[in-house]
Amino acid sequence: MGIEQRKKEWMESVDAERLWVPKEFGTEIDSSKKRKADMEQLPKLMQEPIITVGIMHAERIGFFFDSPFRCAEFPNITFDGEYEVFLSDDGRVSFFEQQFDSLHFTPIEEQDYTSEDGYFELEDVVIGINFHWERKENQRFKGGLTFMIEHGKVVAINEIPTEAYIFSVISSEMSATASLELLKAHAVISRSWLLKPIIHNEHNANAVLEHRTDDELIKWYERDSHELYNVCADDHCQRYQGITRARTENVRLAIEATRGLVLMSHGEICDARFSKSCGGVSEVFESCWADVHYPYLERVVDVKTPESVASAPDLTVEANAEAWI
């Protein structure tokens, strides 16, 4: 099958849809009647989901509030400044010499997720887990902060609106200085990947999948293997480093231009997984993940001209794969 035919089939299987009204929708429209008519063209409008993100695990977590926060467990106290939580001897969250199953902090003031003010900071967040560049750094976040216990450690969880999460992801995964069009594309892809299991109720706790033969066992851990939150903050899900790197006008413009937009296929949000490097040829979904075929996740040869596609070897042949590598 030629590249043009594959491109045609892919384009026919994928569409874009806006799930909620853009924040600035209609501000430039003079006629309220026209604004109402335009809004009626937006299908399946919904409230922007709040996303929960697992940031870090440790026996002790130090944190800092840049602005006043309230705590559900201490309703009469305003929290501002430096604090810390510990793993107690009985396996709970220790704070102010008391033990809790969970602690919930929320900002008192309304937050602008594109500004650098009104944040909370976590100490020694590990990034690049199990990569050669793994290291610790302090990171700043907007939204709410919850502490719970997971895997015998205290876990810090950030609660944040979807668009604020995407605002950080496209700066953390790529670079905030990338071109506007690249940032727009990344925003739509990341938003689609994030929302597919949430909106289509596909969450399945402890989702550890495997493929087994007589001499081989392959296991992979899906994003919905997380029980206490939607996604984690590292490369297992999508790299999310708060407002630490999200500081350019192009990032803000990319989010506003694509707000609520996702990729759709046959009435469902696309599983828009992405990678940083394909080695020259991408793989079909079912060869990497679950044994499911998605027509929009086909093998793609990364070449300069369509004519070069025919010269790409069949990498399912071991000898060809070794020579290609």
Regions found by a protein language model. Give the residues of each.
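Conserved, single-site charged/polar hotspot
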Residues: G2-I325
